[in-house]
Amino acid sequence: LIKILPQLTLLVREQPDSRVHLFGYPEWQTYTKDHLEAFFELDTYFYSSFYTNNLLPAAITFTKSYRKWYGKEMDERYPKFGMLGFDTGYFFLKGLSRYGSGLEKNLDKMDLVPIQTGFKFQRVNNWGGFINRKVFFVRFTKNFELIKLDFD
């Protein structure tokens, strides 16, 4: 990434009519702080099963509450395990409060907006459990917008 970004940004600047979109991997979110400007300039996309925009009110509130409760910042890892635990717990506890023992048959009706981790469960087979098939596309547009797209 560190080798290709300067080359691609140079190409886009020298040939502004060229259509360049950069598509990357989930671990690219770990490089956002270092390459934010290039990500916007190159209209960058990456896919991930987890992502949070730290500027959204829910993320800000969660981060402040985490700091208050635990007296420290969340580790800079991806996924952020504090948020992963919250999203997972909230999803299933809310589901149990709504549907009780019928949650398994109503997973597709859960319409919560998580902070970081999405859920879309699919049964593996009649005798097995479920797998989470939720994937997001994260896009950094040339207009400096950060968009988290649901991909079902």
Q: Predicted segments — roles?
A:
Residues 1-152:
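Extracytosolic ligand-binding ectodomains
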